C-alpha cells in the first residue's frame, strides 16, 4: 500500500487560523486512509442525572455553521440532546494518528435539510426509520422484522415520507481541538474557542 499524502504535516497544522478549513483537510486525509467510515464520530450526551452517554454516529454534513448528524428524536440520544441542548463529539483516525474534539450547543436542522437527506437514503433505511422504535425495549428480532415487513407493504408504491420524529441535529461549536500524535507523547494540540457560535475564534497551543 502506498503511503497517504497528507495535506497538512504535523508541523504546519498548528499555524492554521481557520478550524473548519483545517477540519475539511483532515477529513479528506481520513477518507484516503481509513478502511471504514472516515466520518464516524463518537457523540457524547448527558442524561437528566448528569451521567454521560457516548456512542458512534456518522457525520453527514458540516460547514461554518456546524456539524450535522441524523437520528430518531425519540431515541435516548435524541431526548438527551433535546433536554440539555449541548453535546460533544470526538473524531479519531488511527491511520493518521489524529483526533478532533468538538463541543457546543445543539440545534435542530431545518425540515428542508432533513427532507433532502432522508430522500437520499436507501429505501431500506427509510423503511427502517419507521420500523425501529429506537432505544426502546425490543421483544425479539422477529418483532423488528415484522415491523419492517408491515412498513414495506404500507409504502410499497411511491415515496416514503420522513417520520416526524426523525431528523437531524447540528452542533454549533464553541470549541474545536486538533490533536496529532508525536513521539514520546509530546503531541501537538491546538485549541480554537469562541464565546458563542457567532463569535470570533481564539486560538491556543496546548501542552500535550
From Swiss-Prot:
GO MF, one annotated term: pyridoxamine phosphate oxidase activity
Copy the pathway line from the protein's UniProt record: Cofactor metabolism; pyridoxal 5'-phosphate salvage; pyridoxal 5'-phosphate from pyridoxamine 5'-phosphate: step 1/1; Cofactor metabolism; pyridoxal 5'-phosphate salvage; pyridoxal 5'-phosphate from pyridoxine 5'-phosphate: step 1/1
Query: Any note on cofactor binding?
Result: Binds 1 FMN per subunit.
Q: Where does FMN bind?
A: 55-60, 70-71, 76-77, 99, 134-135, 179, 189
Highest taxon of source: Bacteria
In which residues is substrate bound? Answer: 60, 117, 121, 125, 185-187
EC number from the UniProt entry: 1.4.3.5
Keywords for this entry? Flavoprotein, FMN, Oxidoreductase, Pyridoxine biosynthesis
Tell me which Gene Ontology terms the entry assigns under biological process.
pyridoxine biosynthetic process
Reactions mediated catalytically? pyridoxamine 5'-phosphate + O2 + H2O = pyridoxal 5'-phosphate + H2O2 + NH4(+); pyridoxine 5'-phosphate + O2 = pyridoxal 5'-phosphate + H2O2
- Which InterPro entries does UniProt cross-reference here? Pyridox_Oxase, Pyridox_Oxase_CS, Pyridox_Oxase_N, Pyridoxamine_oxidase_dimer_C, Split_barrel_FMN-bd
Gene3D superfamilies from the xrefs? Electron Transport, Fmn-binding Protein, Chain A
Pfam families found in the cross-reference section: PNP_phzG_C, PNPOx_N
The prosthetic group or cofactor this protein requires is: FMN
- Enumerate the PANTHER family for this protein: PYRIDOXINE-5'-PHOSPHATE OXIDASE, PYRIDOXINE-5-PHOSPHATE OXIDASE
* Sequence similarity: Belongs to the pyridoxamine 5'-phosphate oxidase family.
Function (record text): Catalyzes the oxidation of either pyridoxine 5'-phosphate (PNP) or pyridoxamine 5'-phosphate (PMP) into pyridoxal 5'-phosphate (PLP).
> Partners and quaternary state?
Homodimer.
Q: What is this protein called?
A: Pyridoxine/pyridoxamine 5'-phosphate oxidase
Q: Supply the gene name.
A: pdxH
Amino acid at each position: 500500500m502506498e503511503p497517504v499524502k497528507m495535506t497538512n504535516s504535523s508541523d504546519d497544522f498548528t499555524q492554521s487560523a481557520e478550524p473548519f478549513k483545517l477540519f475539511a483537510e483532515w477529513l479528506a486525509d481520513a477518507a484516503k486512509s481509513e478502511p471504514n467510515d472516515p466520518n464516524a464520530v463518537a457523540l457524547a450526551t448527558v442524561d437528566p442525572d448528569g451521567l454521560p452517554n457516548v456512542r458512534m454516529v456518522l457525520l453527514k454534513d458540516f460547514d461554518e455553521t456546524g456539524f450535522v448528524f441524523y437520528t430518531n428524536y425519540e431515541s435516548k440520544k435524541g431526548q438527551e440532546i433535546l433536554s440539555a441542548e449541548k453535546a460533544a463529539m470526538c473524531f479519531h483516525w488511527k491511520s493518521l494518528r489524529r483526533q478532533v474534539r468538538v463541543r457546543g450547543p445543539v440545534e435542530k436542522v431545518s425540515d428542508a435539510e432533513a427532507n433532502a437527506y432522508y430522500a437520499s437514503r436507501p429505501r431500506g433505511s427509510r423503511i427502517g426509520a419507521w420500523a425501529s422504535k429506537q432505544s426502546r425495549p425490543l421483544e425479539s428480532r422477529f418483532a423488528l422484522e415484522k415491523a419492517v415487513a408491515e412498513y414495506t407493504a404500507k409504502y410499497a408504491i411511491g415515496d416514503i415520507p420522513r417520520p416526524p420524529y426523525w431528523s437531524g441535529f447540528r452542533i454549533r461549536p464553541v470549541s474545536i481541538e486538533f490533536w496529532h500524535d508525536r513521539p514520546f507523547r509530546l503531541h501537538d494540540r491546538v485549541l480554537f474557542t469562541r464565546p458563542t457560535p457567532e463569535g470570533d475564534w481564539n486560538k491556543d497551543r496546548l501542552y500535550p
